[in-house]
Amino acid sequence: MRTGTNNRTQHGLELEVENLGAHLNAYTSREQTVFYAKAFRKDVGQAVDIISDILQNSKLDASAIERERDVILREQEEVEKQVEEVVFDNLHEVAFQGQALGRTILGPKENILSISRNDLTNYIKSKYTADRMVLVGAGGVEHEELVKLAEKHFSGLPVSQNPIQLGTSQYEPGRFIGSEVRVRDDTASTCNVAIAVEGVSWKSPDYYPMLVLQSIFGNWDRSLGSSPLMSSRLSHIVSTNNLANSFMHFSTSYSDTGLWGVYMVSENPVSYTHLRAHETRGNL
């Protein structure tokens, strides 16, 4: 989006979005790259046109790529300063060893430094294909209208050499591997720990029950000043025994697997063992 397209300059693209009163952004997760727009009902067609133009006609100028490379390197530095992000990256690395889900979203620094324009264009040609993309609308948009917009703007997309059938995946399901990693830093003021078991996928019938279970176990943070009795029984135990500064339960789902667990921060170096004992005993 920062490079402009064959039909729109970067400035022209920004001005067009601003004049619509719209919001245009993109993000990458461990499984998807998403380009999205929020616009008024009357501007849905133009919003889809803009997204289509970005996906299919981006210029990828060398100077713009270098600017974005610097942005990503700075972003990576900021992520590495956030202990919670580092802990969850390590958790994914050991839970899904040797698999795509075990990699970080930004990737290693050497890849960011070495990626070239040819790498990007080859990736777009091989991955931005009709069988690997989905157009989704929510809110003030009619289904039939969105179908027509998809036909208008995306019908010319090629398909992969080995097309992916709707509702299937070309990859093996993620394999959860029980393991452990510890990173010691004697200068750190807190112990930051994540413990997880294999969770469920988005399409699992247990997806919503696992979210309910996450809510039952709850979250707690001493700095918020709320009474431990207002949350789960576990929060009362943690508060009374000074086991942690805070904890939160999480249920992270992917297309074919997931992680369910707890993340805790504590100034008490022995609290990990005690909190784990309460978790396994089912003290809610």
Set out the residue ranges of the language-model regions:
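Buried hydrophobic packing residues in well-ordered domains
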Residues: 17, 35, 51, 72, ...
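An aromatic/glycine/proline-enriched structural segment found at the starts
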Residues: 97, 101, 105-113, 129, ...
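A structural supersecondary motif
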Residues: 194-201, 217-268
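Active/ligand-binding-proximal structured segments within catalytic/core domains
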Residues: 1-17, 63, 91, 128, ...
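Helix N-cap motif at beta-to-alpha junctions
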Residues: 40-43, 139-143, 267-270
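Conserved small/polar residues in nucleotide/adenosyl-binding loops
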Residues: 273-280
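Scaffold signal of the M16-like zinc-metallopeptidase fold and its non-catalytic homologs
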Residues: 4, 79-131, 149-153, 220, ...
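M16/MPP (pitrilysin/insulinase) zinc-metallopeptidase core fold and M16-derived inactive scaffolds
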Residues: 1-38, 81, 219-220, 224-243
